[in-house]
């Protein structure tokens, strides 16, 4: 799901 991908992308740098 797009939301899951977005969450992952935002969490990667953190």
Swiss-Prot record:
Broad class of where this protein is predominantly found? mitochondrion
| Keyword vocabulary terms for this entry | ATP synthesis, CF(0), Hydrogen ion transport, Ion transport, Membrane, Mitochondrion, Mitochondrion inner membrane, Transmembrane, Transport
| One GO location term (cellular component) | mitochondrial inner membrane
Name the membrane topology term. Multi-pass membrane protein
- Biological process (GO) annotations? ATP biosynthetic process; proton transmembrane transport
Q: Which residues form the signal peptide?
A: none
Where is it localised? Answer: Mitochondrion inner membrane
Family membership: Belongs to the ATPase A chain family.
Question: Whom does it interact with, and what assembly results?
Answer: F-type ATPases have 2 components, CF(1) - the catalytic core - and CF(0) - the membrane proton channel. CF(1) has five subunits: alpha(3), beta(3), gamma(1), delta(1), epsilon(1). CF(0) has three main subunits: a, b and c.
Q: According to its UniProt entry, what is the function of this protein? A: Mitochondrial membrane ATP synthase (F(1)F(0) ATP synthase or Complex V) produces ATP from ADP in the presence of a proton gradient across the membrane which is generated by electron transport complexes of the respiratory chain. F-type ATPases consist of two structural domains, F(1) - containing the extramembraneous catalytic core and F(0) - containing the membrane proton channel, linked together by a central stalk and a peripheral stalk. During catalysis, ATP synthesis in the catalytic domain of F(1) is coupled via a rotary mechanism of the central stalk subunits to proton translocation.
> What's this protein's name?
ATP synthase subunit a
- Whose protein is this, by species? Spinacia oleracea
Gene giving rise to this polypeptide? ATP6
């Amino acid at each position: 799901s797009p939301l899951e991908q977005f969450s992952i992308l935002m969490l990667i740098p953190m």
